[in-house]
């Protein structure tokens, strides 16, 4: 049994979120939550929320035992980019790219 949860349009770049996602792939959920709780990265908070949601989905919808769950797959895809203008000297302008990402966590029983 596999259960997934998604956070779409997360306000962090996919590159930064993948650093966190790579740390928890394949781990038991208790160990993954421990790693995410003590990680100093902003993306760790976002990934932890998605993991908590996936665990709750597995428990509520499938009746799964939390102690038996593992992080099956974690992937982070790029979302749309918001483009902003930063005025510069001599009438020029630079683009500011506000990147978003789609975080998906799949938990499965052993």
UniProtKB/Swiss-Prot annotation:
Pfam families: Ribosomal_L22. It comes from Shewanella denitrificans (strain OS217 / ATCC BAA-1090 / DSM 15013). The gene is rplV. Belongs to the universal ribosomal protein uL22 family. GO terms for cellular component: cytosolic large ribosomal subunit. The keyword Transmembrane helix does not apply. This is Large ribosomal subunit protein uL22. Coiled coil: none annotated. GO terms for molecular function: rRNA binding; structural constituent of ribosome. The keyword Isomerase does not apply. It comes from the Bacteria. Keywords: Ribonucleoprotein, Ribosomal protein, RNA-binding, rRNA-binding. GO terms for biological process: translation. Part of the 50S ribosomal subunit. This protein binds specifically to 23S rRNA; its binding is stimulated by other ribosomal proteins, e.g. L4, L17, and L20. It is important during the early stages of 50S assembly. It makes multiple contacts with different domains of the 23S rRNA in the assembled 50S subunit and ribosome. The globular domain of the protein is located near the polypeptide exit tunnel on the outside of the subunit, while an extended beta-hairpin is found that lines the wall of the exit tunnel in the center of the 70S ribosome.
